[in-house]
Amino acid sequence: MSLRLDGKNALITGGASGIGRASSLRFAQEGANVCVADRQASAAEETAAQVTKLGRKAIAIQVDVSNPAQVQTMVDRAAKELGGIDIVLAAAGVSAANYGEGKVESKFLNDLPFEEWRKVLSINLDGVFLTCTAVAREMIKQGRGGRIIAISSGAAKVPLKGSGDYCVSKAGVWMLMKCMALELGRYNITANAIGPGVIDTPMTKDMQGDPRFERMINRTPLKRIGKPEDVANTALFLASEEGSFFSGSILHPDGGVMMQ
């Protein structure tokens, strides 16, 4: 039986942890070569090594997705070393300005310093724009179409009190994918977003045990936290032939939250 991504080349930002790491490995299991791009160099190297163990070509690149020069260098290197880019998954993101630096605290918008707002938007929205447009230019040059996928959130549609910066950034990602789908369809390039629910990743570790987190689980009809693999399988569908007629959509692996 043929693999669903056999011979394809994928670039995954945020590819060394959480949803990005699960997607790097899932894509490799289905035959893709993978460029694992992440701000944590050692974690990117470790994930790339796991991709190699699965029999695929892998490269690891350290990148700050909010830096235009670094993003362009990442795309150029991935295209050169992999032999082109067929799929991009923009999974790099933060839940708050101090993500990774201690416990994430909710802040109402009127108490949110502008520099913290900008940090979240620069990674979650600017970073997706820079990554996906740079890859789109490469795909157009290659002339063989492609798949653009970005991680948004259920918070793109339903606001979370105290997380306005995150919600706005993820709503922007969804609209960005719709606009790219409209503009890139003539090149046989699809663009879609994924809006996960509550997923067990490093981003949610600080929240677990918090009453607000427990309420989020209780609002999930399936009454469980999602796994990174739940989202990786959604990305795999959009990257594969089965997802070839989806464009401008947002899919919600969320245990049923968005139907309410």
Region locations from a protein language model:
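Short, small/polar-rich loop/turn modules that mediate ligand/substrate recognition or access, typified
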Residues: 89, 185-190, 246-248
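Residue(s) in the substrate-gating loop at a strand-loop-helix junction
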Residues: 153
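C-terminal helical subdomain
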Residues: 193-196, 215-242, 246, 255
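Active-site helix of classical SDR
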Residues: 132, 169, 177
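Short C-terminal tail/terminal secondary-structure segment
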Residues: 2, 158, 235-236, 247-260
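Substrate-binding pocket helix/loop in short-chain dehydrogenase/reductase
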Residues: 99-118, 216
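Alpha-helical segment proximal to the catalytic Tyr-Lys
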Residues: 137, 141, 181-183, 244
